[in-house]
């Protein structure tokens, strides 16, 4: 079981260089989870870049049987703790944004590795999926 960050979904949908590696990890993950807050974040980014990509994302998530996880109160607490420790403006090299904090919280709450792109989460205590 793995948690997927917005950045990984975007890399696949937008056919970025890392996209194929992320797709392989999602296929191998058997049970992939995406937080509802990160689903919204992904749709917002895609809508801003090119709304025509949103159906592709929806189809990808459906074909991979990605489970959308609601945000619980305890995950909200974990996300706030992540912000205080790793968030933008906290003078930490991770500089997690709002969506990052929720992906971090879901992964921590469920004890799952996180599939992500970029150099933000590597500065946290999260377990990377790849």
Regions from the language model: what does each represent?
Residues 1-34, 46-59:
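Short, well-structured N-terminal submotif of metal-dependent ribonuclease cores
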Residues 9-10, 39, 121:
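A generic structural signal for short hydrophobic patches within well-formed alpha-helices
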Residues 33, 67-69, 129:
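General small-molecule cofactor/ligand-binding pocket signal
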Residues 68-113:
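Active-site neighborhoods of divalent-metal-dependent phosphate/nucleic-acid chemistry enzymes
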Residues 104-130:
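Acidic, PIN/NYN-like endoribonuclease modules and their adjacent C-terminal/linker elements
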């Amino acid at each position: 079981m793995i948690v997927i960050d917005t950045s990984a979904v975007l890399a696949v949908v937008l056919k970025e260089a890392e996209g194929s590696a992320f797709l392989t990890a999602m296929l191998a993950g058997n049970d992939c989870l995406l937080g509802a807050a990160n689903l919204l974040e992904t749709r917002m980014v895609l809508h801003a870049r090119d709304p025509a990509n949103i159906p592709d994302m929806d189809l990808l998530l459906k074909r991979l049987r990605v489970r959308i996880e609601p945000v619980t109160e305890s995950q909200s607490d974990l996300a706030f703790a992540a912000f205080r420790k790793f968030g933008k403006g906290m003078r930490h090299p991770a500089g997690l944004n709002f969506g990052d904090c929720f992906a971090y919280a879901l992964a921590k709450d469920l004890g799952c590795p996180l599939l992500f792109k970029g150099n933000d989460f590597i500065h946290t205590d999260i377990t990377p999926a790849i």
